[in-house]
Amino acid sequence: MNALIDNRVLALAGVVQALQQVRQIAETGQSETSAVRTAINSVLRIDAESPEAVYGRIRDLTQGLQLLHDYFGNQLRDQLLPRLALAVLQLERRFIRDTSIVAAVSAGITQAAHQVEQTGDSAHPEVLSTLGALYANTISHLRPRIIVQGNPHYLGQAGVVAEIRAMLLAALRSAVLWRQLNGNLLDFMLAKRAMAAATERALR
């Protein structure tokens, strides 16, 4: 049981780490390249079914795990982040049921993977632009629509918007993994203590 919860926590860490980048980019116009690479790499590993296969090293999820640790300890300062995470988890249910959108996203990810091979960098602006456009043309049509708040100066820049959308796609990818691991919204009420313990284990 512990192993399953440990894996769910890693998937959730992937969700919130990508969304933390969304929040940061929207407010400052800047992202953390290492976190962006971890997020985009998880998207490209579309057929992977375990956290290790999706994210690689657990330490690459340290930021997300720390955010979860703060959330479970009632110490999270950003009150918008949990709302965004809940919206993404709800959106995942709509996404996975729409086979046409799933197919379109899969094809778009394959195109982005070719770009990564050409540029040698999963955080390259061309890759982020492709994935951002993919999100806009597919997932953004689903409901609930994810609303991102931030600095209007940055939210008016095409490159910033593309990177935000690419990070939202990454958050959704982690939400899909979370559901594959039998994650349920009831976890936040009925298994909160167990998830908090799993977060602490992952951070050791």
Swiss-Prot record:
SUPFAM superfamilies: YcfC-like (SSF101322). It comes from the Bacteria. Keywords: Cell inner membrane, Cell membrane, Cytoplasm, Membrane. InterPro entries: HflD, HflD-like_sf. Its main location: cytoplasm. The keyword Transport does not apply. One of its GO terms (cellular component) is plasma membrane. It is a peripheral membrane protein. It is found in: Cytoplasm; Cell inner membrane. Pfam families: DUF489 (PF04356). The keyword Magnesium does not apply. Belongs to the HflD family. HAMAP family: HflD_protein. This is High frequency lysogenization protein HflD homolog. The gene is hflD.
